[in-house]
Design a protein with these regions (language model features):
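Surface-exposed, flexible loop/turn segments at secondary-structure boundaries
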Residues: 76, 124-125
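Hydrophobic adenine-recognition pocket in adenosine-nucleotide-binding enzymes
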Residues: 92-95
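A short acidic, helix-capping loop that chelates divalent metal ions and anchors anionic groups
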Residues: 125-131
Length: 180
């Protein structure tokens, strides 16, 4: 299933040459670590991993003994998306070409074993593509994104941020455990 056009992939590769591009996961790593450890997860799939800053920061924070599966079309050496207990998709959705958004959501649905941690900006990016477009190709409000996710995911938690929101999702087949 195609998730990116060849032309846009080339634009993304050139953006990834900038050392300051793809750093959003660094500040979110403490939240990812807390979620990971509190749920006794064993694996993380980093969808849109870029330079693997999430993995590097989790290791610096002391998270050990976890399987890490990076995926990013700009880094074909990472391979295909892999299923994991926790699938992180940080600062990715807003960069997806609109015509491939449903394919990306389907990809994520297929690899989430337990939970998905999505961080999405709802404002324009500070960076522009070589062709002059804003790096955020999809700039929509939180409710637009949530309505898109509701047919595929169970929304467990939503947190608004300064530039967008973070959402914790489960596949729609998820059943909430009884409260003790």
């Amino acid at each position: 299933m195609k998730t990116i056009s060849e032309g846009y992939l080339n634009l993304q590769k050139s953006l990834h040459e900038n050392e300051n591009y793809g750093t959003a996961s660094i500040s979110l790593a403490p939240s990812v670590k807390k979620l990971f450890t509190s749920n006794n997860f064993k694996s993380i799939s980093d969808y849109g991993a870029g330079k693997k800053n999430l993995q590097k920061t989790l290791l610096k924070l002391g998270l050990k003994d976890f399987k890490y599966f990076p995926f990013d079309p700009a880094y074909p050496e990472y391979g295909l998306p892999e299923p994991a207990d926790l699938v992180c998709c940080i600062d990715v959705f807003e960069h997806v070409e609109p015509e491939y958004l449903h394919n990306v959501i389907a990809d994520l649905k297929d690899i989430i074993i337990n939970a998905g941690f999505f961080s999405i900006a709802t404002i324009p990016a500070r960076k522009t593509l070589r062709d002059g477009r804003n790096a955020h190709l999809i700039i929509k409000p939180t409710n637009w994104w949530l309505s898109l996710f509701l047919s595929t995911f169970y929304i467990e938690h939503l947190q608004q941020t300064e530039s967008g929101f973070i959402v914790l999702v489960r596949n729609n087949s998820y059943v909430m455990p009884p409260k003790s």
